[in-house]
Amino acid sequence: MNQLSQETSPYLLQHATNPVHWKAWNPNSLSEAKEKNKLIIISIGYSACHWCHVMEHESFEDDEVADVMNAHFISIKVDREERPDVDSVYMKAIQIMTGRGGWPLNVVTLPDGRPVWGGTYFRKQDWMQTLSQLQEIYLSAPEKMIDYADKLHQGIQYIGIIQNENQNVIPSAVEAQEQILALVEKWKMSFDLEFGGIASSPKFMMPNNYHFLLRFAHQKNDNELLEFVNLTLTRMAFGGVFDTVDGGFSRYSVDNKWHVPHFEKMLYDNGQLVSLYSDAYKLTSNPLYKQVIEKTLSFVERELMNEDGGFYCALDADSLNAENHLEEGAFMCGKFLN
């Protein structure tokens, strides 16, 4: 049976009525997988995640999917905001396996928790087909899964070793300058010189990256790079990703022009963007940046601060539409002007 009703996490409680026999991440759940020698499904997300909601509706609320999951797997739900440690481990595994990551993060592991397969969002039929194939392999050739899990585990450990080794190697000042210059030159090759940001879509704001580029451009008197950062910040401020009515930035832009936002608003995104625009305002005195800062801080204080002085982590992308159904961006209306 589903065991999430006694949890305190908003995300886990959202799944408490699913027909899937979800369990929380705890020693009992992990022990049960070993005792029954079953593969584990570890599904990680958070309460404001749009694609988590979509996959729940399409798959985890579906009796046919639940029958497959309940019969052959131990299914564990994890709130990444409660257990960032668990999220970090399996995110590294997914990035090694697929070259990318995101949420919902869905991983299938051996009974001991070592991952053998994973990804992010899956449609119902793809999800069911994959689970059936994995179960068949586990029954007919478990040694293949064990061998793959061993190699993947070594890969995750190798990443850790490389990071630790690099932390102990301190380059000289000249070497450090050369490395940074090479990094920036390589970075410039991916710049979108028309709309700012990186030339791709979806387009994320990546405030830490532009913080670095802003400071680097200022220190090196690199006017071309400074103009690019200003182009990016200006395009973002005039794009659909910035809410000119209520303030605050959405999670990312679906298109490459910053026009169509993914409507979720995250506290940590907006906090970093306030810092970025503040530094940019110090250097340029651009009144647009000051307006962005003031509107964003007003949004955070009005919408994300609770009565006790704490902060909520996000505003969900989904809200009720006129038919009383959850829909991404239903609370927004507007049109694009060319």
Model-inferred region functions:
Residues 1-338:
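Replace the tail clause
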